Amino acid sequence: MNILLSIAITTGILSGIWGWGAVSLGLLSWAGFLGCTAYFACPQGGFKGLLISACTLLSGMVWALVIIHGSALAPHLEIVSYVLTGIVAFLMCIQAKQLLLSFVPGTFIGACATFAGQGDWRLVLPSLALGLIFGYAMKNSGLWLASRREQHSANTAVTK
């Protein structure tokens, strides 16, 4: 069984579980899938990738709240929102000099989830966090399944 098929199987199973779990817990299922996406897209794998993804998602949420609350200070001057968005977008990219904030797409995913969740960080945060953990489980259980299948095939070939 190849790696892609193994990851597809575990992702399919765990996606169904996540969909049910998110609804049962009153979380945003779509935000959870953004958390999954962040882990899958992060160039680092394993625990390091999980940590980097978590830090960038969280920083994106904070930056989105800066834009939301900063824009609210001058609601009748739309230009303030545009300038603030430009400055924050610059900072979201430049922060990638730091290893734990080096996954720029994760930062933007966290910000977009916060905007889509209308700034309700108390709902967005656990949705993203659990989704991120599910993404970690999806990919790593798929890799485990593929390696187990490969070991089984190798053992079968040796005994023949």
UniProtKB/Swiss-Prot annotation:
Keyword set, alphabetical order: Cell inner membrane, Cell membrane, Membrane, Transmembrane, Transmembrane helix
Domain of life: Bacteria
Subcellular location: Cell inner membrane
Transmembrane segments: 20-42, 50-70, 72-92, 99-119, 123-143
Primary localization class, coarse: membrane
Keyword Transmembrane helix: yes
Pfam (any one): DUF1097
GO CC entries: plasma membrane
Membrane topology: Multi-pass membrane protein
Family membership noted in the UniProt record: To E.coli YahC.
Protein name according to UniProt: Inner membrane protein YcdZ
Organism: Salmonella typhimurium (strain LT2 / SGSC1412 / ATCC 700720)
